[in-house]
Structures are given as C-alpha cells and as structure tokens.
Amino acid sequence: MKKNDIRLYNVLFPIWFLFLFPQLWLIMLPANFVIDSLVVSLSALRQKLEHPFTLWRKSILPIWIIGFASDLIGAGLTVLLFYGFGILGRLGIEIPNLILFPGTPLISIPGLILAGFLIYFLNRTFSFRSSALDAQQIHKLCLHLALWTAPYTMLIPLYG
C-alpha cells in the first residue's frame, strides 16, 4: 500500500449493538450512507472518472441498500456459526474454547468475508448498470466498496 492511500472502514456496523439499542438504526442508516458516498466519490476521483457526481447520484441508493443488506447477511452467517458450534458442543463434539468464546473474531471471519463478497458481486451486478463505465472501472469501484465498507466491527468481541 502506498503511503498516501486512504482507507475508510465501515466501522458503524456492530450488529449486536443495534439489537441492544434499536434507536441507533436512525443513526446507522445515514452514517452508512455517508461512508458509502465517501468511498464511491473518492474512488471515482482517484480513477479520474468523468462526471463523478452523476455517477454518485445514479448509483448511491443501490450501493447503500446492497451494503446494508450484505452486512446483515454476513452478521446472520456469524450468528448461525456461533449457534451451530454451540449445538455441536452440546452433542459431545469437542470444539476448542477459543472458537466458542462469544463474539470471537474467529467465528466472525466467514461473515466478514461473505459480506465483502456480496458487496462486491451485487454492486458489480446492479449498482452501475446505468453508468457508461467499462468493466475495469466498475471492477475497481466495486473492489473499493467491498474492501473499505466491509463490516470490520464484526471482529470486535462482545465482551471479554
């Protein structure tokens, strides 16, 4: 990575926090919109794309919806893995305590990877359909979205 690269992480998606404090959805939705907007705008400017504001205006709504839905699906996989390992433990199948620690980053990694993949694939498929961008430009935009807006806060343990 170059010294002057900018990284923006979607640090605003701790799924467990939203269930503890449901009113935070009112903050999370606009905050994710702002982060997605920054990533699309900075990526378009970095690639020197023509009419970055028009690109943002035409693509931000699907990007925002896809990003939030991908985060939820990734968090859902994490929850399924957590409960799945718990069930295996009750059935007598030995699982290291490191994996069963609630909220452990090891269980969250597949959910994080799934969310990043979905952000990339779904944005590539749907978000830039009406743009005049070539495949390489779309690839770079979607890769930036996937890498910079993946829900990295899923790696934070719930307690410990």
PLM regions and their residue ranges:
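Juxtamembrane/disordered regions of integral membrane proteins
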Residues: 1-160
